[in-house]
Each structure stands twice: as structure tokens, then as C-alpha cells.
Regions:
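Mid-domain Rossmann-like dinucleotide-binding core that forms the NAD(H)/NADP(H) cofactor-binding site
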Residues: 138-219
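Glycine-rich cofactor phosphate-binding loops and adjacent beta1-alpha1 units
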Residues: 160-164, 209-285
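Glycine-rich beta-strand-centered segment in the early N-terminal region that forms part
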Residues: 22-36, 49-96, 135-137
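C-terminal hydrophobic helical "lid"/dimerization subdomain
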Residues: 3, 220-221, 249-253, 257, ...
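Generic hydrophobic/aromatic pocket-lining and core-packing "Φ" positions
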Residues: 42, 181, 203, 248-252, ...
Length: 343
């Protein structure tokens, strides 16, 4: 089968190759891939910033498809099902985290598209436990965004709980920020989305998605806008989705005393300067959130089924598998929102 592989560490080092199809084991499901979203992790792997623990490996982990084969022990999934899948492929099954189904925290976890061959391919293998059958109202294109949506669900509804009376600030109008804003808005909260001048098209898209206020922080005073909408208190919750240290430190003083700051974006450096004074003096709860877990997926699919998340406006380009490089170049250019590769 055709597959896009990271063949060795370093910049690019990616090729479209023909590799053998994997055999389905007893508890596994073979999926004919329909669409795969290009994730920031895929881009960082392309540029060599993300250090894979294993190469060569087929990339791709945000996918949808149709089941073509199931293992003999599989009982809940059948051939012909339209599905998406969690990225978790291997866990120890014994640690405290696995016993609570917090697979995202298992020290022995291996994920599809990073350590295990992923979905930038004609077919992908997943374990039955990770596979979710799509509701009838969710199409294969929308389903390819379930994984990043589940990450946003985990951040907003599991690591903390957004309430309808909350005033919420979100940094970063990229795919994650736009999904995060929609998840928060679906709870009835008031949402302010902050970006920079080059994000103008994304901020305009956010307005069309129902986001209450968008701010170009290079042209407008974010502090003034936040304090105006919150009667001077600051926001109840802040989701930092850009992975920019400047946004982190600009945001902390804008959180209400006793408010919550959720770090969704990943920083390029392990250690960064942090406005500790704001956290301490304002009694801010600073929360880290990593990936997603099974419960996140159930909620994400429900949101998609109820049409509370608009994926159509976010998917701005689709390229065939053979032209995967055009898709990556489109993401790197910064001119697209979400790019899918069609297998």
C-alpha cells in the first residue's frame, strides 16, 4: 500500500513509499482511510523539531475511514462501519492511569502516527477499544477532526468545566484555538479570541463561527477589551492555544482572581519565564492538559452529531495522498486553516 513515511530524523526526510499491508491481530481493526488531518505534530516532525522515538514510521493520526477487516476477537466493530479512532495503540493496562482509562498518561503508551504506523496511508490498523463508530449525522470529513476536537473537549470539559456564565479568553486562532472556541461557545459561555495581525482571516472565520469577540492584539488593547467585558475583574477561564510564552504572560494578569488558566498549546522550549506573581497573588489555578482520553471522544462525537461544531468552514484544502507534499506546504505557508489528505 502507499504510505507517507518519516524515513529518518532531520528536516523533511519524508517519502511516499509502497509498504506491505499489516495483518490484523485478534483485537484489531483494519480501516480503509478516507481522510487524515495534517496536525501541528506532523509539521514539527517534518521540520525535525519533534523527535520521534521511532523511524521509519508512517505519520498521520487525525483520521476517518471505513472498516474493511476485523480480528477474530472483535465484537463491537464490523466490516463496513464508518469510523474514527483514538491515537492510543499500546498501553500497559496495569498502571493507575490505565485503570482509570487515562491512557494519555500511561508511561508505556504508544500512539498511532508517532510510534506506530499511522494514517497517511491507504490503510491503518487500530485496536478495537480505540475505534468509534460514527453517528449517522457525522460525515467522514468532519470525523477527521475528532481527534483535535477531543483534545479541546478534554481541556474545557474534563480538566476544568466551562459554565454558561463564564467569560473566557482564548489565545491562538489556529485549528486548535478555533475548535477550543467552539467547544467553549457550545457551553453557552462568552468567548474572546485573541490573535495577531497575520491571523486576520482566521479571526474573521471565528466571527462567522459565532465567537463573540475577536481581538488583534497588535492593533487593539487586549487588556482594555477584556476588562470592559468582565467589569474589570478579568476572565473566569483562559485557554492558551498558541504555545507562545508571550501569550502566556500576557494572559495571566487578565485572569480573574481565583480564575483558571489552561495551557493547551505546547511550548518550543522545556523551560520558560513565567509570571509567577500573577499566579500567586491572583490565586490562579494553572492547569496542564495533554491530548485526550476515551471519554473525550464520546463527547466530541456528540458535539459533532449535534452540529455544535462547524468543521466545514475550517477545512480549507483537501489533497490526494499522492500529493501529500502540497498539503504540508500549504500548512507551512500559513494560508490554510485545516488541510486534509484524502486516501
Amino acid at each position: 500500500m502507499k504510505a507517507v513515511m518519516k524515513v529518518e530524523p532531520g528536516y523533511d526526510k519524508m517519502q511516499l513509499k509502497t509498504i506491505p499491508e499489516l495483518e490484523v491481530q485478534k483485537n484489531q481493526v483494519k480501516i480503509k482511510v478516507a481522510y487524515t488531518g495534517i496536525c501541528g505534530t506532523d509539521i514539527h516532525t517534518f521540520t525535525g523539531q519533534y523527535k520521534n522515538s521511532q523511524t521509519p514510521v508512517v505519520l498521520g493520526h487525525e483520521f476517518s475511514g471505513i472498516v474493511v477487516e476485523v480480528g477474530e476477537d472483535v465484537t463491537k466493530i464490523k466490516v463496513g462501519d464508518k469510523v474514527t479512532s483514538e491515537t492510543t495503540f499500546v498501553t500497559c493496562g496495569e498502571c493507575d492511569y490505565c485503570l482509570e482509562k487515562d491512557y494519555n498518561l500511561c508511561a508505556h503508551r504508544k500512539g498511532i502516527g508517532t510510534q506506530i504506523n499511522g494514517s497517511f496511508a491507504e490503510y491503518v490498523i487500530s485496536r478495537e477499544e480505540s475505534v468509534h463508530v460514527l453517528p449517522d449525522a457525522v460525515d467522514l470529513k468532519a470525523a477527521a477532526l475528532t481527534e483535535p476536537l477531543a483534545c479541546c473537549v478534554h481541556a474545557a470539559l474534563e480538566k476544568t468545566v466551562v459554565k454558561k456564565e463564564d467569560k473566557v479568553l482564548i489565545f491562538g486562532p489556529g485549528p486548535i484555538g478555533l475548535l477550543q472556541a467552539q467547544v467553549v461557545k457550545a457551553q453557552g459561555a462568552f468567548v474572546i479570541l485573541a490573535g495577531i495581525t497575520k491571523d486576520q482571516k482566521r479571526l474573521e472565520l471565528a466571527k462567522s463561527l459565532g465567537i463573540d469577540v475577536t481581538v488583534d492584539i497588535q492593533k487593539e488593547s487586549l487588556e482594555e477589551i477584556v476588562l470592559t467585558y468582565t467589569k474589570g475583574y478579568g476572565v473566569d477561564k483562559l485557554f492558551e492555544c498558541s504555545g507562545a510564552v508571550q501569550a502566556l504572560n500576557q494572559g495571566l494578569p487578565l485572569v480573574k482572581k481565583k480564575g483558571t488558566f489552561v495551557q493547551v498549546g505546547i511550548f518550543s522550549e522545556k523551560l520558560n519565564l513565567l509570571d509567577q506573581e500573577s499566579i500567586i497573588q491572583r490565586e490562579i489555578t494553572y492547569i496542564g492538559t495533554r491530548s485526550q482520553k476515551p471519554s473525550s471522544w464520546h463527547i466530541a462525537l456528540k458535539l459533532l452529531e449535534e452540529k455544535k461544531i462547524n468543521t466545514d468552514k475550517m477545512i480549507t484544502k483537501i489533497v490526494p495522498l499522492d500529493y501529500w507534499r502540497q498539503g504540508f506546504e500549504a500548512v507551512l505557508s500559513g494560508n490554510e486553516i485545516k488541510v486534509l489528505i484524502q486516501s
